[in-house]
């Protein structure tokens, strides 16, 4: 499993990308 912090950043970036689109 990846570093939880990196996982959170990845999910946040994904969410932000969907929200901005």
Curated annotation (Swiss-Prot):
Predominant location category: secreted
GO molecular function, one term: toxin activity
Entry comment describing in which tissues the protein is expressed: Expressed by the venom gland.
Keywords annotated in UniProt: Amidation, Secreted, Toxin
Subcellular location: Secreted
Keyword Transmembrane part of the UniProt annotation: no
rRNA processing among keywords: no
GO cellular component: extracellular region
Sequence positions bearing Serine amide: 21
Family: Belongs to the cationic peptide 04 (cupiennin) family. 09 subfamily.
Name of protein: Cupiennin-6e
Organism, scientific name: Cupiennius salei (American wandering spider)
